[in-house]
Amino acid sequence: MKRILIIEDDQGIAELERDYLEANGFSTDIAADGKTGEAKALGEAYDLILLDIMLPGRDGFQICRTIRETKDIPILIVSARQEDIDKIRGLGLGADDYIVKPFSPNELVARVKGHLARYEQLTS
């Protein structure tokens, strides 16, 4: 079972992501702030990370940069920030995708599945 870390401070959004992912056979962990999320991402084994940008403790851009220094797993940014500059910055720091809130939960699951399939092909 693929394991996904959700780093999201909005409990409602985190639970929505969790519910849809678990209904599709994924195992999930939730971190509600940047520092906890970064520690989990670096200290535990995950197959993919869903990462918000605006987080208490440490922002998602910093977390993305830090994860990319040591891990090669898909990172999908899920953020209310919809300006091109934010998308370009996130992708430039190593995110594999950038999804703007509000989002379709079914589209989120489809993107997660697509990124996991591509990473699996690249690493096998």
Model-derived regions: residue spans:
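N-terminal/domain-start alpha-helical segments
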Residues: M1-T123
